[in-house]
């Protein structure tokens, strides 16, 4: 059981403290918005990307655009700045179809480091084509800076309440692994129990057969002993006279 707990800790604890609500950015149709994501020093040489978050239970990427590339007909670009440990995502000519959740991530071995971002797009108006969105909504060019001294995953900066969301697979993977290990352990224990029970039943059956053979042998010896006299000779059985006849002895007449 102890190895299972250790494995569970290795899978869950590294990203457990980063599971919080996503940050929202917004803009009007036709606007250009940008956001910046920071990363730790050890992730400087890793590839950065921007993608649309898909999947209901397990998060996955669609329409991925890597650093130095342009996607969606040039409307999306990702520019990495290793000197400042941050990369910038620029979204041009927004449309209502662009609304949804996105991932700002860094490729690495195992699980990627990602930040979930919700993009809101409002219908454009002729009165203020490039004005700020309604009150209560974050500005289009919001910086999503995140640094951490305890973990390499994205965390909110001190000047912003941006929060980070880790893909649901980070939570489901340890659960599935633990369930698989518990199932394997249970099946092994059940198989061992059934094997021992079968051996005990087989041993009891063999013992019962031996007892029957031994008892039958003793009964045969007792029957044989009843036919012998104390000297070991066979004792003839007494013959009973036939009904209506006298014993079959020779008759002698006196002289």
Curated annotation (Swiss-Prot):
Residues spanning the signal sequence: 1-17
Segments on the Cytoplasmic face: 192-255
Top-level taxonomic group: Eukaryota
UniProt keyword annotation of Transmembrane helix present: yes
SS bonds (residue pairs): 37-104
Domain Ig-like V-type: 18-118
Modified how: O-glycosylated with sialylated oligosaccharides.
An individual GO BP term: signal transduction
A GO MF term: transmembrane signaling receptor activity
One GO CC term, this protein: multivesicular body membrane
Pfam families from the UniProt entry: V-set (PF07686)
Compositional bias per record (Polar residues), positions renumbered to this chain: 139-152
Keywords per UniProt: Cell membrane, Disulfide bond, Endosome, Glycoprotein, Immunity, Immunoglobulin domain, Membrane, Receptor, Signal, Transmembrane, Transmembrane helix
Membrane topology: Single-pass type I membrane protein
Ranges annotated as spanning the membrane: 171-191
Family the UniProt entry places it in: Belongs to the CD300 family.
Record's function text: Receptor which may mediate L-selectin-dependent lymphocyte rollings. Binds SELL in a calcium dependent manner. Binds lymphocyte.
Entry remark concerning the domains of this protein: Ig-like V-type domain mediates binding to lymphocyte.
Protein name as catalogued: CMRF35-like molecule 9
Gene from which this protein is expressed: CD300LG
């Amino acid at each position: 059981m102890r190895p299972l707990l250790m494995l569970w800790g290795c899978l869950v604890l590294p990203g457990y403290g980063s599971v919080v609500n996503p940050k929202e950015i917004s803009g009007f149709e036709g606007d250009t918005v940008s956001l910046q994501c920071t990363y730790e020093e050890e992730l400087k040489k890793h590839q950065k990307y921007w993608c649309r978050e898909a999947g209901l239970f397990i998060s996955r990427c669609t329409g991925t655009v890597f650093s130095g590339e342009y996607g969606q007909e040039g409307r999306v670009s990702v520019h990495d700045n290793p000197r400042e440990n941050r990369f910038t995502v620029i979204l041009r000519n927004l449309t209502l179809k662009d609304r949804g959740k996105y991932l700002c991530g860094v490729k690495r071995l195992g699980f990627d480091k990602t930040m979930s971002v919700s993009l809101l797009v409002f219908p454009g108006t002729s009165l203020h084509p490039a004005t700020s969105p309604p009150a209560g909504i974050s500005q289009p060019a919001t910086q999503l800076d995140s640094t951490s001294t305890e973990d390499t995953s994205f965390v909110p900066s001190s000047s912003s309440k941006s929060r980070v969301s880790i893909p649901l697979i980070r939570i489901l993977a340890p659960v599935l692994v633990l369930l698989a290990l518990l199932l394997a352990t249970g099946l092994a224990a059940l198989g061992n129990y059934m094997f021992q029970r079968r051996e005990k039943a087989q041993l009891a059956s063999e013992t019962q057969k031996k007892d029957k053979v031994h008892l039958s042998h003793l009964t045969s010896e007792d029957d044989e002993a009843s036919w012998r006299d104390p000297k070991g000779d066979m004792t003839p059985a007494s013959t009973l006279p036939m009904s209506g006849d006298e014993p079959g002895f020779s008759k002698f007449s006196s002289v």
